[in-house]
């Protein structure tokens, strides 16, 4: 994957290869999350300290599971299939009549998420196709009207809470099934154009004709009714993941959703819920809690108006969110672990997606990837949980990432490319002890004056340290070196 600069909600210099693989949601997100440079409006009275406390569990836990599940698991070609191919309404209705994930076991999902080291989970209660995974009284287009007949959302929250995980709801602002949702550039009913992914160039005069019998006011009320259901009938909801706003051109803005009214409703029902940034309230200071770079790695801690913000990278195992039977682009174990470490090393979270198949199970490939996370987090979890970006005075050697635990004053060196020899670090005079995290074995270190190979030079004998690593990489993916820093107020680390 490539690196990009993320500043004020914009991503600079994406590669051509990256642009070719963007989904519509990413495309719209990158082009619409522009931040006004004027003083932001405040919708609520929460102080920064209160917000920090509200998000404290989330910024500590760092790692979550995204679950994209719905009718699109049957065609097994991704969650945007109705838009991208496109699939006719008649064909998609057939998936509704056939939907019966009879091997679904929310307890199995929850156990696998917990074993993988994930601390929270977010389920697609409704994706863009409009199909609802709960027994909503405001639509017939719901899971309880399929052959399956069970409330998946209820089983999800009960199972994940039982395993001690926080639970969240993804809710699509788009709805391709609702008769009042107006047709726009991201709607399967848009005028057909020459190219499959060509949205621009459609004449504005086409849309009033297409939408003459549609009423967004009625759809807005439908959304609010459903959000009220989700935030009233399922107990405490920890995260609300709304998706998405795309104003240009012939799209939808925050006014189409009445995002302010929607967020006020959310806060009135669940004051402690954490909400992402995709409702389009970019000119506010508190219309969102965290930003959501999708399927790319940031090169530095994201900022808005020059200030660092809470953020969460959302990533997939293979490039698709919904189940994709024939995907050939599955990431390696090392790549997946690096995504987690990379997010934490830049002060953020990672939510990694699983797309269950049409039987309701995680397929074997997904299970193997979750097991890879499980092996790594069991041994190295303390290098991500409660960790953040290292202080600037610590420079990451080439081929490594650094994470830092403020409470224990520990620095962690993640060896993405094993050096196969001594590792030179520029950590000043702060190293007290060094060891591999996976087995606790000591790593000897000594002070040196220079390292021409890494273009590191110090005169006076301070700053450079040589860690004596074994010549062969330990039998673990992405080994981690724990550095206990000198701090008279920090007790020696106690192994659990």
Placement of each model-derived feature along the sequence:
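Intrinsic structural disorder/low-complexity segments
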Residues: 17, 32-34, 71
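Generic short amphipathic/hydrophobic targeting helices enriched at N-termini
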Residues: 7, 20-22, 477
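Mature catalytic domains of secreted/periplasmic carbohydrate-active enzymes
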Residues: 37-496
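Bacterial N-terminal signal peptides
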Residues: 19-32
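Short, low-complexity intrinsically disordered segments enriched in A/P/G/S/L with frequent Arg
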Residues: 13-15
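Short, aromatic- and cysteine-enriched interfacial helices/patches
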Residues: 3-4
């Amino acid at each position: 994957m490539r690196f990009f600069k993320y500043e004020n909600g914009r991503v600079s210099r994406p590669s051509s290869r990256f642009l070719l693989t963007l989904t519509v949601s990413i495309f719209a997100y990158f082009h619409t999350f522009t931040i006004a440079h004027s003083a932001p409006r405040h919708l609520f009275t929460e102080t920064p300290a209160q917000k920090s406390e509200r998000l404290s569990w989330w910024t500590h836990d760092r790692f979550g599971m995204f679950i994209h599940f719905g009718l699109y698991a049957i065609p097994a070609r991704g969650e945007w299939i109705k838009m991208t191919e496109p699939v006719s309404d008649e064909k998609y209705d057939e998936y509704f009549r056939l939907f019966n994930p009879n091997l679904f076991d929310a307890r199995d999902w929850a156990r696998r998420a917990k074993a993988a080291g994930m601390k929270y989970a977010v389920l697609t209660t409704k994706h863009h196709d409009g199909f609802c995974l709960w027994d909503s009284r405001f639509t017939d287009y719901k899971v309880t009207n399929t052959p399956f007949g069970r409330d998946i959302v209820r089983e999800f929250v009960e199972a994940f809470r039982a395993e001690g995980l926080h639970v969240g709801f993804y809710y699509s602002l788009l709805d391709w099934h609702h008769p009042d949702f107006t047709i726009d550039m991201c709607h399967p009913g848009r005028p057909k154009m020459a190219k499959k992914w060509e949205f621009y160039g459609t004449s504005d005069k086409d849309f009033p004709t297409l939408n003459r019998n549609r009423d967004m006011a009625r759809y807005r009320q439908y959304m609010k009714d459903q959000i009220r259901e989700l935030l009233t009938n399922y107990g405490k909801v920890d995260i609300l993941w709304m998706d998405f706003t795309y104003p240009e051109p012939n799209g939808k803005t925050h006014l189409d959703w009445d995002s302010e009214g929607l967020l006020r409703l959310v806060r009135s029902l669940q004051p402690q819920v954490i909400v992402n940034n995709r409702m389009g309230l970019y000119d506010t200071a508190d219309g969102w809690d965290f930003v959501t770079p999708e399927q790319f790695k940031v090169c530095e801690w994201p900022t808005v108006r020059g200030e660092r913000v809470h953020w969460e990278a959302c990533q997939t195992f293979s490039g698709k969110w919904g189940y994709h039977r024939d995907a050939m682009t599955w990431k390696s174990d090392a790549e997946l672990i690096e995504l987690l470490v990379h997010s934490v090393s830049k002060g953020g979270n990672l939510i990694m997606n699983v797309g269950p198949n049409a039987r309701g199970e995680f397929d074997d490939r997904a299970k193997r990837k979750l097991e890879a996370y499980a092996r790594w987090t069991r041994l190295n979890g303390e290098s991500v949980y409660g960790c953040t970006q290292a202080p600037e005075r610590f420079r990451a050697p080439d081929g490594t990432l650094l994470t830092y635990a403020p409470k224990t004053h520990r620095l962690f060196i993640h060896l993405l490319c094993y050096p196969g020899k001594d590792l030179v670090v520029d950590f000043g005079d702060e190293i007290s002890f060094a060891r591999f995290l996976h087995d606790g074995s000591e790593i000897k270190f000594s002070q040196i004056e220079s390292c021409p190979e890494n273009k590191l030079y110090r005169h006076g004998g301070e700053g450079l340290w040589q860690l004596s690593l074994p010549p062969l990489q330990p039998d673990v993916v992405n080994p981690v070196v724990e550095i206990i820093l000198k701090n008279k107020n920090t007790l020696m680390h106690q192994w659990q």
